[in-house]
A protein has these predicted regions:
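Conserved glycine(s) of the Walker
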Residues: 16
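Phosphate-binding P-loop
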Residues: 1-4, 115-116
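Hydrophobic positions on the alpha1 helix immediately C-terminal to the Walker A/P-loop
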Residues: 20
Length: 155
């Protein structure tokens, strides 16, 4: 088995990360994870098909992960999910009330960490607003991944 790879495209909003990645997709950059794309898709369908990302992802583990998370609205903290989603094998049906950027970001976080465990190559983008993204790359290296960090900025 070849060495798994992670490609992180970092940069501010509007810098062109998604545009660059679209050019790279045909060049075997692994599964592409993008919270913005996922949020749009969830708002249209209210459904997440985990097999779209990989057959080895476990829907019940994702639900456990999501139900342990909260989101902040000003000074208020509330659960990420207002109700448990309906799960049928790899397909998860969310309440339209719960679908927002926080939910999409947490789903992508879950998939990223599962891919580390499963040693699956992938590419993702981030505004890199927290040092945990660098820690994630370090953790990936410790697990045998070859890591790439591309910083995209506009002038």
């Amino acid at each position: 088995m070849s060495q798994p790879r992670i490609r992180m495209f970092a940069g501010p909003n509007g810098s062109g990360k998604s545009t660059i990645i679209q050019y790279l997709l045909p060049h075997q950059i692994g599964t592409y994870l993008n919270a913005d794309d996922l949020e749009k898709q969830l708002k249209q369908t209210q459904r997440l098909d985990l097999s779209h990302y990989h057959d080895r992802l476990d829907a019940s583990k994702l639900i456990i992960f999501l139900t342990s998370k909260n989101k902040k609205h000003g000074d208020l903290i509330s659960p990420l999910l207002s109700q448990n989603p309906v799960v049928q094998q790899k397909i998860i049906q969310f309440s339209s009330f719960d679908i927002d950027s926080y939910l999409a970001a947490r789903i992508i976080d879950f998939i990223r960490f599962e891919f580390l465990t499963l040693k699956i190559s992938f590419t993702f983008e981030t505004v890199m607003s927290h040092e945990s993204k660098v820690d994630f790359l370090k953790q990936a290296q410790q697990k045998g991944f070859k890591t790439y960090l591309y910083y995209v900025a506009t002038v």
